Amino acid sequence: MTRSREAMLRLFRVGDNRAAATVPKPAIFPGYVAPIVRKAADGERELVNLNWGFVLLQKERAPKRVTNVRDDKILTSPFWTPSFQQRRCLVPASSYCEPKGEKPASWHWFAVNGEEERPLFAFPGVWTRYRGPLKKNGPNVDQEVFAFMTTEPNALTASINHERMPVLISDPADFETWLSGSTEDAFKLARSYAAEQMRIVQFGADREDLLRVA
């Protein structure tokens, strides 16, 4: 997320008094804090910082961070469906990366087309409160966490990662549908973004978006 707090507030129509402090970051990693937009109890939008990744408890193994929810699981999985029905959110972004190859991987950064160098968009996501350990036999924590949805890749993404891509939305009407619409209408947004409306803006060994945009 290379864009400023002010840019996020404008696009996602969040009042300054309903927004937490946040600064542009060249990359966001699982388990770390990132800004998301959700509806508060009074129905107004708010920008808050949550930890990336739901936590899946596993027998005899350490808890696992799950950062993405598949579109073919979100309606049927007990792990995801309650959050999809009751706690949807928008994850602001200006780019995202996918690896190609390994040892070392080449990281390809994708952005949507627009007049700006890195136009803002959102990953439709879900959030919840997690109370429990993050490590095997570790102490319990109390965190609000989020994950975002993935779907089948478009042609551009499939050239790098043939398995999945995040769902992207950039239309303000779709923001409202995801936050407040019915589950049926929200699920209609679970589609791959048009390949011709995206581009690869950077590739190489860096796992950070090297562009700094206000």
Label the model's feature ranges.
Residues M1-A214:
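Short linear sequence motif anchored by a di-proline
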